């Protein structure tokens, strides 16, 4: 496996916390502590377009494809709805005074993870809050939706994973998963596994069809693992960490294949916060507290 650094995108004035696809096939959005939401084109490196100013730090973005709207999580302020056609804010809803860590869509619902231990369920067409689900005493850091099983999972700073039914939002299972905060929960593309990471620097993989039994527990990094993502062809996955590194793993064996760091590949200088693996030339994108977004070719 060969790793090549393709580009570095600079433009943010502070830590970059999140990156999501813009669904063009060759672009993405980023946001972070400066409150800027920027659109980038992988075909035109480092020419970012400022599409929104949130006014507060942003941990979470989500693009709703059918309505062409982007949901922006304004920490302590609520949700902004951006029309991606003209880049104008169409609606706002002050759903919380807390931080917003994650936004996920399931059918016509938006699931929003908050810093006060609540998941807010909003109706997408009406942009109305439908319910509050109090899950934890501390922050809900991540949400993952499994369409195959009609479930969603949450990871929280109480060290737990909770599995809910998507229809009635009934709690199905609680797993004391990690020894510290859970930072990321992601279902594998086929829906068979749940990947969880956290402050304890462990990557854990759970078998969805075996009542979420543990498959493997890997001490994968030196410090907290912030995110996990999957390659478009489903053969690999990657993790990123507060230890400044990105690691690439084999999906079939869960074995480490490559480490991307500052010494080997001119990687990030501080915590790597989020990953996005694109279908554009199999490029892997990472963002960091160093204000930079790096693009990697994995071959």
Where are each of the predicted segments found?
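Residue-level detector of Asp-centered blade-edge/turn motifs that repeat once per structural unit
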Residues: 23-24, 65-67, 105-107, 147-148, ...
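WD40-repeat beta-propellers
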Residues: 37-41, 79-82, 122, 161-164, ...
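Blade-level signature of beta-propeller repeat domains, shared across WD40, Kelch, NHL, RCC1
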Residues: 271-299
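Conserved strand-to-loop turn within each blade of WD40 beta-propeller repeats
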Residues: 31-34, 73-76, 113-116, 155-158, ...
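Short loop/turn segments that connect beta-strands within beta-propeller blades
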Residues: 42-45, 83-87, 124-127, 165-169, ...
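WD40/WD-repeat beta-propeller blade N-cap
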Residues: 9-16, 51-58, 93-100, 133-140, ...
